[in-house]
Amino acid sequence: MLEEFGNVIAPGGAGVVIASQSGHGLGALTAEEDASLAMTPADELLGLPMVQPDQVRDSMYAYQLSKRANALRVMAEAVRWGKRGARVNTISPGIIFTPMAKDEMTGSGGESYRRMIELCPAGRGGTPDEVGTVGALLMGPDGGFITGSDFLMDGGLTAAYRFGELAP
């Protein structure tokens, strides 16, 4: 679908795709894997060796890989959109207090979510309005120089997983 929008986007247009903080939780991929996820036509993605059942460890890995692919595909697509005078970016939110997140907080994984929030630098989850504010920046004239970028807005959760108390 992203490619189709790229075919019709008007000069001066902008787009935002929601990815996820989870894509940042995936370990490093090779340059070849990044390029494959970014550039393979959408209808051929399931043929990539890296997404074959024997390569996908579990459902979390599959989810993280799909979110990483979202951000990489937008980055690659930004090159094409730029030729039309348009921009496209991703936002990768962490725990945002939507109705779904509130359900997850009270479900079986609730303790894990509460621990992540407690140990992330911001000490709280985000709000839909905060995501909307970043989206408005990216879509509006103040974001005119921003394209092909992924905005990680997770209250520092990824930092805590890499360098803080949530690090392995």
Task: Enumerate the language-model features and the residues they cover.
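SDR active-site lid
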Residues: 86, 95-103, 107-122
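Glycine-rich, phosphate-binding/catalytic loops in enzymes
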Residues: 32-36, 107-109, 167-168
